[in-house]
A protein has these predicted regions:
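Bacterial N-terminal signal peptides
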Residues: 7-17
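Positively charged n-region of N-terminal signal peptides that target proteins for export
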Residues: 1-7
């Protein structure tokens, strides 16, 4: 969620390839800017040609689309609501997102040209963090845990059938957020709170059973994202004090630091070819202030 307004959003290329035990002190590579506004939560399309992202317009978080080179921007939403957590359908024909207005948060879908917006999740739920199943028939999402004490209580993970609107509870008990299904549809990665001072990346079977802790670290960690081939998971965590982006194997082994950033780096997203990770980096701890959209090429990583 991004509730503030910032003035500058940039893409920064970082050439990194380091293990957690040998993190560099300065990012490598030359930084350059493509956009100059509030731009966060960028998600590349399945074909890698377009990027959906969020920009603040007159105090509202609106959805935008641009080409992967930063050109050809179009505004998708223009209503008096906030729009968060965009996610492409596997065929690139729909974009899901959170539509927040008048105290409600529902999962909605829209065409990439900005037409055909439809709310699909129940208004009785405060829905967040939608992601599509590989077959494009369902959307996973969670309920609002508010992320701020003492409001942490229950956040369940659901699947909704896009055609029938039927909702199935997959994971319950505690605070479970950021669900995303593996490319082969066999597993769900998600973030689970462990008390008030720790969160971990978990993985469960596709029906929500057999949850197991992958990160097992005393830090706050979450925001999981599967690599296109399903062999690795990117995530964000503050195990090095500041929130940074890491990559691990799908079994939780071989954790590597992707980008040595300052501030709060979260919401990693893989490029369709698996060679880059996009993420949002906020220079302040609270979301939405001085946030940059960044991309880290992984050519030199030990895969």
């Amino acid at each position: 969620m991004y509730r503030g307004i910032v003035k500058v959003g940039v893409f920064v290329v970082l050439l990194t390839s380091v293990r957690e035990t040998a993190a560099q002190t300065e990012p490598l590579g030359l930084a350059y800017q493509l956009t100059y506004s509030f731009n966060v939560d960028n998600v590349p399309s399945p074909d890698g040609e377009r990027i959906v992202f969020i920009r603040a317009i007159e105090g509202r978080a609106q959805l935008f689309l641009m080409n992967s080179d930063g050109r050809g921007e179009i505004q998708l939403t223009r209503d008096a609501a906030d729009h968060w957590d965009p996610a492409w359908s596997p065929d690139g024909q729909k974009i899901s997102f959170v539509h927040a207005k008048d105290g409600t948060k529902v999962i909605a879908i829209i065409n990439p040209d900005g037409t055909g917006m439809e709310e699909i999740s129940p208004k009785t739920q405060r829905a967040l963090h939608p992601s599509w199943t590989p077959d494009g028939k369902r959307i996973l999402y969670c309920t609002d845990d508010d992320l701020r004490p003492p409001a942490k209580n229950e956040a369940e993970i659901y699947a909704i059938d896009v055609a029938t609107k039927h909702v199935t509870t997959l994971i319950s008990g505690g605070v479970n957020t950021f669900p995303v299904m593996s490319p082969d549809g066999s597993r769900i990665a998600f973030r689970r709170m462990i008390g008030e001072m720790n969160s971990e990346v978990f993985v469960a079977d596709a029906d929500g059973s057999n949850p197991r802790n992958l990160t097992n670290h005393p830090a706050f960690e979450g925001w999981p994202a599967w690599s296109p081939d399903g062999t690795r998971i990117a995530f964000a965590g503050n195990r090095n004090s500041a929130y940074q982006i890491f990559v691990m194997r799908a079994d939780g082994s071989d954790v590597q630091l992707v980008a040595n950033t300052e501030g709060r780096a979260t919401t990693p997203r893989w490029s369709p070819d698996g060679n880059k990770i996009y993420f949002t980096n906020c220079k302040h701890v609270d979301f939405g202030r001085s946030c940059d959209v960044m991309v880290a090429p992984l050519e030199g990583e030990n895969r």
